[in-house]
């Protein structure tokens, strides 16, 4: 109880000693005079308390007296009243307590000549720092920002549920080496702006999803509105194209259907030859480098460059027919049951792509206005 009263006196408003006492910068605590010992325990013996100043010497008796008179009064309210009362006291009334404080300080210096006051850290500030570091650790489990940039920006669109989050780049221009980033932030990067990080990552994820609704490589921008008559909205074939292209590799038979990644939008026309795969890889690497310096800027440049792509083809999917439904069902069957039929279906589907795109290009040209974006 006494130690709690001492701590409250330390933080009370009137805790500053009298000007004549010279005790404002004094160190230390407890062992001698009226200061009392450390409680006899090992922790109490290790930590030496500071000597009392004049206000503490006076308020020790006054606090006990006021607590007896007002047993329901809170300790903080008692401290406020004691501080206000100490301020209005005259110098003559304070003199005996100032002298007692000087004696206690001299005794403390004699008993602890090498004592140096070390203030204890406040737990509130530590909790705030731990909260920010914990939030940074939850956002990312990869290496810190400044590591090697992520090369795999062009992973298959929609192949796995976490694909979009894994492809996002760090705003600082250098994502971590692994694909363990959630929302594109590295571990411990920008710990003080967690809300801004979440907002930026959500914007980038929406942009990636908007471009991922249809298979990549087209010269026609994406229409988010389902009421356009020339392309019914059907995002399901995106999974079928990507799964077939990654699992069964029909790239060489599809007349240049080589781009299934968001970094390859507008990079190559559908009429290119299979030997241009290296050019596609170079274009994807260049787009990845551009995305690392600013993912949103790269998306904006791609939107601007899409209408001028030649030949004017569209990348929109057709309405599903019963055959497509069977293909979609067979795509998600285990490898032992539907592996070969799915491979054959994917091959035939990709063989028919050039004719479909050429027929669709007669109705829709590549210069559609971008007012819908």
UniProtKB/Swiss-Prot annotation:
Entry superkingdom: Eukaryota
One GO CC annotation: nucleus
Motif 9aaTAD in this chain: 327-335
Stretches with biased composition (Gly residues): 17-43
Disulfide-bond pairs as recorded: none
Any GO BP annotation: neuron differentiation
Name of the featured protein: Transcription factor SOX-1
Free-text note on domains in this protein's UniProt record: The 9aaTAD motif is a transactivation domain present in a large number of yeast and animal transcription factors.
Job of this protein: Transcriptional activator. May function as a switch in neuronal development. Keeps neural cells undifferentiated by counteracting the activity of proneural protein and suppresses neuronal differentiation.
InterPro entries documented for this protein: HMG_box_dom, HMG_box_dom_sf, SOX_fam, SRY-related_HMG-box_TF-like
Gene3D superfamilies in the record: High mobility group box domain
């Amino acid at each position: 109880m006494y130690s709690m009263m001492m701590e409250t006196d330390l933080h009370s408003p009137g805790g500053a000693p009298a000007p004549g006492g010279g005790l404002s910068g004094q160190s230390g605590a407890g062992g001698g005079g009226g200061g009392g010992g450390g409680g006899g325990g090992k922790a109490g013996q290790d930590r030496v308390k500071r000597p009392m100043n004049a206000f503490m010497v006076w308020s020790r008796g006054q606090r006990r007296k006021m607590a007896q008179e007002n047993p329901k009064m809170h300790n903080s309210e008692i401290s406020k009243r004691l501080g206000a009362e100490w301020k209005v006291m005259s110098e003559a009334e304070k003199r005996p307590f100032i002298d007692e404080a000087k004696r206690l300080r001299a005794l403390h210096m004699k008993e602890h000549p090498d004592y140096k006051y070390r203030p204890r850290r406040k737990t509130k500030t530590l909790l705030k720092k731990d909260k920010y570091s914990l939030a940074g650790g939850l956002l990312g489990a990869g290496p810190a920002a400044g590591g090697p940039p992520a090369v795999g920006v062009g992973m298959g669109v929609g192949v796995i549920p976490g694909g979009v989050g894994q492809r996002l780049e760090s705003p600082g221009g250098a994502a971590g080496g692994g694909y363990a980033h959630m929302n594109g932030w590295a571990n411990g990067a920008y710990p003080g702006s967690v809300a801004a990080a979440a907002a930026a990552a959500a914007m980038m994820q929406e942009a990636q999803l908007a471009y991922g609704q249809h298979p990549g490589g087209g010269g026609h921008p994406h229409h988010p509105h389902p009421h356009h008559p020339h392309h019914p909205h059907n995002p399901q074939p995106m999974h079928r194209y990507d799964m077939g292209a990654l699992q069964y590799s029909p790239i060489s038979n599809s007349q240049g259907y080589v781009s299934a990644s968001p970094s390859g939008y507008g990079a190559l026309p559908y009429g290119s030859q299979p030997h241009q795969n290296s050019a596609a890889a170079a274009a994807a690497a260049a787009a990845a480098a551009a995305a690392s310096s600013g993912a949103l800027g790269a998306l904006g440049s791609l939107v601007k460059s899409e209408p001028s792509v030649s030949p004017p083809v569209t990348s929109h999917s057709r309405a599903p027919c019963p055959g497509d439904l069977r293909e979609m069902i067979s795509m998600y069957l285990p490898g032992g049951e539907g592996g070969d039929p799915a491979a054959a279906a994917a091959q035939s589907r990709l063989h028919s792509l050039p004719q479909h795109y050429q027929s669709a290009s007669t109705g829709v040209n590549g210069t559609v206005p971008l007012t819908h974006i």
